[in-house]
Amino acid sequence: MSVYTVKQMARLSGVSVRALHHYDAIGLLKPRAVGANGYRYYDRQDLLRLQQILFHRALETPLKDIQAALDQPGFDLAAALRAQRERLAAQAERYARLVDVVDRTLADLEGDETMDDKHLFEGFDPEKQARHEAWLVEHYGDEATRRIADAKAGMKSWGKKDWSQFQEEAKAIEHDLAKALTQGLPVDSAPVTAIMRRHWAWVGRSWNREPTPDAFAGLGHLYQANPEFTARYEAIAPGLTEYFSEAMRAFARGR
């Protein structure tokens, strides 16, 4: 049976050594053995468990729920793979529709075809948005209801270019913050503060009003409390959710 060190495991799977250490620390993926020299060693069963973790992450499952699923008594790997295949196939179909919308939108912007406005949002998941809004209202009450209404009112006038820029900026902020995390930058460092300044502006655009410091810090708490946000950020980089939230609170304190 093949045995892998943590570096070999990282090269084989594409998961960083830092992430594997994090998974070990939280009990999600413990090495099969630890040598007298402190080296972690993994076997094929560990590879299959890591594969499961990555499938769950692709499906935006929160880390704590992944661990609960994998550690349940009588866990059936083959059954889990079949269920994941079904969900991934459905997701692939939705992504294919989104790719088609991207292509048609680009063709519209470049003057090659005219795209009806009603087709701009084909392929997006209205159920997911509805779940997110319901969660906000449940946890934050009437204030969340008002903010959702304000945001929707502001976005009604957005065109294709507005939506594209909004989404690209969100991805850029997440990418830059994940890079800061891997570099070990403090949340109140100048580079992270600059990223948070961009996020502050992005949130203001999303809400159709400038956030207060308390509201901005509260949004950071929401990122940690809401499973869908947690799944999104942890899929980008392990530990990003907490880092993002702390950076937002640090920025809010300085406003």
UniProtKB/Swiss-Prot annotation:
A molecular function (GO) term: DNA binding
Domain HTH merR-type: 3-72
Cleaved signal peptide residues: none
CDD domains: HTH_TipAL-Mta (cd01106)
DNA-binding region(s), chain positions: 6-25
SMART domains hit by this protein: HTH_MERR
Superkingdom, taxonomy of origin: Bacteria
Record keywords: Activator, DNA-binding, Transcription, Transcription regulation
UniProt keyword Transcription regulation, yes or no: yes
Function: Regulates the induction of katG (catalase-peroxidase) in stationary phase.
Protein name: HTH-type transcriptional regulator SkgA
Natural source organism: Caulobacter vibrioides (strain ATCC 19089 / CIP 103742 / CB 15)
Organism placement in taxonomy: Bacteria, Pseudomonadati, Pseudomonadota, Alphaproteobacteria, Caulobacterales
